[in-house]
Amino acid sequence: MPTTFKEIPRERPVTPLLDRADTPHGLRRLGEAELETLADELRLELLYSVGQTGGHFGAGLGVIELTIALHYVFDTPDDRLVWDVGHQAYPHKILTGRRARMSTLRQKDGVAAFPRRSESEYDTFGVGHSSTSISAALGMAIASRLQGSERKSIAVIGDGALTAGMAFEALNHAPEVAANMLVILNDNDMSISRNVGGLSNYLAKILSSRTYSSMREGSKKVLSRLPGAWEIARRTEEYAKGMLVPGTLFEELGWNYIGPIDGHDLPTLIATLRNMRDLKGPQFLHVVTKKGKGFAPAEVDPIGYHAITKLEPLNAPAAPKKISAPKYSAVFGQWICDMAEADSRLVGITPAMKEGSDLVAFSERFPERYFDVAIAEQHAVTLAAGMACEGSKPVVAIYSTFLQRGYDQLVHDVAVQNLDVLFAIDRAGLVGEDGPTHAGSFDLSYLRCIPGMVVMTPSDENELRKLLNTGYLHTGPAAVRYPRGTGPDALIETGLDPVEIGKGVVRRQGQGVAILVFGVQLADALVVAEKLDATVIDMRFVKPLDEALVSEAAANHELLVTLEENAVMGGAGAAVSEFLARANILKSVLHLGLPDTYVEHAKPAQMLAECGLDAQGIEAAINERLALIG
């Protein structure tokens, strides 16, 4: 069984077996008796590596043995291995030729936080969002069959990701096309109890063996000729298996279900995977693991050790203590508690983001009004719509990138019916080290085109609270988008009063250039404005746009500059240009925002600089345009 470590090593560990097995080809040259020692070395290497860089932590520790077994048994990369979400893929990266580059994890031009097809041939499908693996692996299995290939397709999905409807859509489809594929459920939520002990592991070996499979198929052919006999035999088999395994649902869908087995028992994993490798049709293996396995603190607190920051050197001077500004999510968390206290109609909904969206306090103070729907964004939005129909006031706390998954519901179920639902959209704009799959680059574009939707962009913590008030008290759908991280430490007013919808605020009066700011770039815009003597307008609303303020700015300035941390295409700046065109106002307009590309992972400041959205980039772009217009 795995060794349990108590500390993260600060020096690179000695790993003689891992040194020989940093690719699957090297791994497969090891003897089976060496693999448990290799697992200890890989776990220690992961502890050291993530300790140096920070990153996702607990999930990878929990799949050390499974990762080794998969690459040992299957002929990767020819056999297609698809990881769901990707939080657990660091051991996979270490074993597939990227060990030497793990020191660059989540850094600019370094190893990505999630599997990327462009990074390695072993990363067969790019991920970041959950519940896509079964559909992707099924598509690969079908395409391989059409091409006459015998390669295997394997999807590894967690119990959390399996709660999403998309996963069940794929589970329902695969048996219809008799796909030759394997789905592995990495169940790290349930404990390893008696039914995952020796008897269950023994049963798994039997049920997955060629002998059992051929006997089962042979018996089916024979018994099918006898009226009623095969049905009796089938029910007897299901009853016997049902006493030991919880696979009835998957069997009913048409999958050959095996398990649950201990995901930290390498011999059992290897034997079971070998047996299942050549079985035809859709196969389902239920593996039970422990998140954070092998690192004592993470086993005790898997949520706290989901991800960690890098270790500071032992001899580093202590950082001076300072009172930091609250995170935008914390401002939201305080606001929803305050508004819930004032209005008993308020209900809070989140798709498995209680901690990230800062809903812990709300869930504890108002448990009967808090709803975590798991990874089910579509359901979250329509659930809110149903609640709104009955007079509740739903607040959907959701990351920008994940709201994309509930877009049809946002339009069809909320907006068309003009229902009172407030979307508190966290992680808007660039999010840093998690990269393009988690960036909130498109919400202004896909929200402002929806009739009746009020779309707001607070410029600091106090504005966030004001605009949350405004959206909540508005009749109809509304959205407030705010970024990851902290703001400029603005003084936060404690009231619950709204602002006038569709009205911006002039923050600095200047001449020549007017910078129309949609969001938290206000601070940088003010810095630039001091140098250029420019006017700065905090627009607040993308929709409805303050057309009177835009008209006034156009009449009194030579150049209008729109500034947003959203895709330029279809974003807030586009709304300004569309209005000017409708009003037949001819004016030079410079749109500053995210380019028509995916911005790769780096520190947020690096990403903003790359896009020209820091103070230096904003100033340079304005001066360049001024030079062109003379």
Curated annotation (Swiss-Prot):
Mg(2+) binds at residues 159, 188. GO terms for biological process: 1-deoxy-D-xylulose 5-phosphate biosynthetic process; isopentenyl diphosphate biosynthetic process, methylerythritol 4-phosphate pathway; terpenoid biosynthetic process; thiamine biosynthetic process. It catalyses: D-glyceraldehyde 3-phosphate + pyruvate + H(+) = 1-deoxy-D-xylulose 5-phosphate + CO2. GO terms for molecular function: 1-deoxy-D-xylulose-5-phosphate synthase activity; magnesium ion binding; thiamine pyrophosphate binding. Its EC number is 2.2.1.7. The keyword Magnesium applies. Keywords: Isoprene biosynthesis, Magnesium, Metal-binding, Thiamine biosynthesis, Thiamine pyrophosphate, Transferase. GO terms for cellular component: cytosol. Its cofactor is Mg(2+); thiamine diphosphate. It comes from the Bacteria. Binds 1 Mg(2+) ion per subunit. Binds 1 thiamine pyrophosphate per subunit. Thiamine diphosphate binds at residues 87, 128-130, 160-161, 188, 295, 377. Pathway: Metabolic intermediate biosynthesis; 1-deoxy-D-xylulose 5-phosphate biosynthesis; 1-deoxy-D-xylulose 5-phosphate from D-glyceraldehyde 3-phosphate and pyruvate: step 1/1. It is an enzyme of class 2 (transferase). HAMAP family: DXP_synth. Belongs to the transketolase family. DXPS subfamily. Catalyzes the acyloin condensation reaction between C atoms 2 and 3 of pyruvate and glyceraldehyde 3-phosphate to yield 1-deoxy-D-xylulose-5-phosphate (DXP). Homodimer. This is 1-deoxy-D-xylulose-5-phosphate synthase. It comes from Pseudomonas savastanoi pv. phaseolicola (strain 1448A / Race 6) (Pseudomonas syringae pv. phaseolicola (strain 1448A / Race 6)).
